Amino acid sequence: NDEPVKQYMMPPIELLNLPNNTNSSDYEREQKLNERKLIDTLNSFGVSTRLVGVSRGPSVTRYEIQPAAGVKISKITNLADDIALNLAASGVRIEAPIPNKAAVGIEVPNKSRQSVTLREVIDQSSYKNAKSKLTVALGKDITGEFVYSDLVKMPHLLIAGTTGSGK
């Protein structure tokens, strides 16, 4: 067989769907309302804090608060159900403390989740310029940053699914 080996060409990215345009003013309104409710809720239980940052991801927003001096972290973590009730959220997750930060993170589910499309993840320079040929696009993290991994560094990766499902 003397046929030359053809170089594989990736299909054009235009075949993939663009992300839906989302109304950022709705997100900002929801965020401001939740910020106020969160601080008011903590204050009503005698927990003095200040908001030091907000990170919005596709499905969760993390509100970073800094407790006043003398406030025990356990007092904040014990209020998870009360915070969820006052924010009308299905539940909240409290990360106390946030690694490498002098703050407590309160993660609240977004009222409307944002879809993350394959196109927007692989259309980033960090993916296109990845050194490994086995870089896999995973999605977005809680801060809205794109997440990738190298399959070479995952020797024990388990892929599950039914027979014939295209694993």
Which residues are covered by each model-predicted region?
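Primarily NTPase-proximal linker/entry elements flanking Walker-type ATP/GTP-binding cores
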Residues: 1-156, 160-165
